[in-house]
Amino acid sequence: MSDDDRRRWNKKYAEAAPAELLQADEWLIDAVEGVPPGRVLELACGLGENAVWLATRGWRVDAVDVSAAGLHAASQLAARHQVTPRLIAADLDRFLPLPNSYDLVVVFRYLDRHRLPELVTRALVPGGLLVHETFGPGQCDRPDNHLRNPAFVLAQNELPELYGQLEVVRYEEAVLPDRSVGRLIARQPAG
């Protein structure tokens, strides 16, 4: 990620209003229902809502983002909810998780077609879950579209193909009130 990207994200997150309520993404809430807490890695955690929500439910969270402003907001949110996720300032172009270390990897609103499959499969333990949701088909056609680069939007059925080495548990493409998405829950093969 370039320094311009880092500055852009810092500016965006510095201007964001602090979260009043702790609200995780619905896809994540559904995906982890009934899953016993373990170690989780959130990539591109932004303001930290998902990371903090997971920590309040007993998960041991490592949350990574390039933006110091986003991580500062995540730290404040965590303090308000009396949890301590480990917040890691890192560029995902260079970040390398320990192998076979996480029961769950979470990615929302982020897409790096080359790097993410490698990071996720490296990080997950056998049987571990990936929960990934990002902008999907139709996003660029929406009147409320804010994306500047269509390269950050999935093609139809692209997300399961990116993670071809994982077992698909559930995949869908959906039009939500504020965005179009591709959503995947996938499992690292057990052996």
Give the location of each predicted region.
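Conserved SAM-binding strand-loop segment of SAM-dependent methyltransferases
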Residues: 81-92
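Conserved SAM/SAH-binding beta-strand->alpha-helix loop
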Residues: 67-69
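A short, conserved alpha-helix within the catalytic core of class I
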Residues: 111-123
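A short acidic, Gly/Pro-enriched loop at the edge of an enzyme's catalytic core
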Residues: 97-104
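Conserved SAM-binding motif I beta-strand of class I
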Residues: 60-65
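Conserved beta-strand signature within the Rossmann-like core of class I S-adenosyl-L-methionine
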Residues: 127-135
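Conserved class I S-adenosyl-L-methionine
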Residues: 1-35, 38-46
